[in-house]
Every structure is written in structure tokens, then in C-alpha cells.
């Protein structure tokens, strides 16, 4: 009978600062979040909404815990995966005209939400009508993609059309939106910056 012993061993630790001069950090302000298409809007609105996106979080995955008990011990296993929500804020500008090509972030997201639930008719939409895909791309100093997340089956679950309105505040209005999605796949671009280590 094979018996595996529980032992404690220290891993070798090596500290060196030689790489510090070559490493280029990924910056929090170099990113683009864009939908492939936005339901209820024309094709130009995906780029328009990406242009005014101010904040966004990256995908996060959590595994539900499952346990099995034997004798005096508990063993842990990974359960079902669960993806977090994506929360974004968008600058809200006054649209220049009534044309669809000049819609504000609030207009675009309202049109999208009406594909999920239309308050005029009371109808709900099919998922194939209101869900789309999106990409969150993080960039290097030269604008090359160094990391990207493709999210599938994404749609808004909450839209706040104006939080904190005040007669004494002249800051730009922002639209807050929360999105759910089915899954995300991380893509690393093959073309890295020439200065990368």
C-alpha cells in the first residue's frame, strides 16, 4: 500500500531587481470597452458609446465551493463557475440633432433597454433580440492590444440615467449601467510592443 506523507518544504526564493528596468506596467487608463452591436440602435452607436465610456471593470470569475467529508477531514472541490457583473459609467452629452447618428449615451442605453422591456407595449424581448457581445481591450503605450476579454450574451440589467443631480453641481452628467453576460474568454494579442521585456 502506497502512503503519501504530508511534508513541509520551502520553495526557493530569488529576488532580483534586474527586470525592474524593463517591465512596463499595464495602466488603468489605457483601455476601450466596445459592444459588437447595440440592440435597438444603428451600427454607429457601438463606437459612439465606447467613446464616452469613463469607467469599467474587468471580468471576474468565482467558483462555487463543494465539499466532501471523510473521517475527520473536509475536502474541497470547485463547483459551478459564476461570472461577475460589468459596471460602467458613461459621459452623457447633449445630442446634436434628432438623427440616430447623434444620440447620447442615455439615448443609446434607453433604446437598448426597450429591446428587453418596452414600456409602451408592455412586451418583453427574446434574448436573441437584446443580448450582444462586447470586448474590453487593454492597451500598451503605443495603442497595441496587450490583453482583451471577449464577453458573450451581454445585456444591461440596470441603467441609472442621472445620479446625484444638484442645482449646485456643474460636473458632467454620467449614466451608470450594469451588465450581465454568459461567459468571457481572455485573448492576448500576438503583437506586443517593441519595448516589452
Enumerate the predicted regions with their spans.
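Glycine-rich, low-complexity intrinsically disordered segments
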Residues: 2-197
Amino acid at each position: 500500500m502506497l502512503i503519501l506523507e504530508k511534508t513541509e518544504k520551502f520553495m526557493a526564493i530569488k529576488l532580483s531587481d534586474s527586470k525592474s528596468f524593463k517591465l512596463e506596467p499595464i495602466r488603468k487608463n489605457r483601455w476601450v470597452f466596445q459592444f459588437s452591436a447595440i440592440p435597438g440602435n444603428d451600427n454607429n452607436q457601438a463606437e459612439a458609446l465606447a467613446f464616452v465610456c469613463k469607467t469599467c471593470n474587468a471580468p471576474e470569475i468565482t467558483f462555487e465551493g463543494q465539499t466532501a467529508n471523510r473521517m475527520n477531514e473536509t475536502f474541497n472541490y470547485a463547483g459551478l463557475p459564476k461570472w461577475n457583473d460589468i459596471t460602467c459609467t458613461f459621459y452623457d452629452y447633449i445630442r446634436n440633432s434628432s438623427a440616430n447618428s447623434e444620440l447620447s449615451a442615455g439615448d443609446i442605453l434607453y433604446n437598448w433597454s426597450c429591446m428587453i422591456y418596452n414600456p409602451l407595449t408592455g412586451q418583453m424581448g427574446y434574448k436573441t433580440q437584446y443580448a450582444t457581445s462586447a470586448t474590453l481591450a487593454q492597451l500598451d503605450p503605443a495603442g497595441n492590444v496587450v490583453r482583451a476579454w471577449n464577453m458573450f450574451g451581454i445585456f444591461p440589467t440596470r441603467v441609472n440615467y442621472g445620479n446625484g443631480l444638484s442645482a449646485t453641481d456643474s460636473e458632467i452628467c454620467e449614466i451608470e449601467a450594469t451588465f450581465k453576460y454568459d461567459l468571457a474568454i481572455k485573448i492576448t494579442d500576438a503583437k506586443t510592443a517593441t519595448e516589452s521585456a
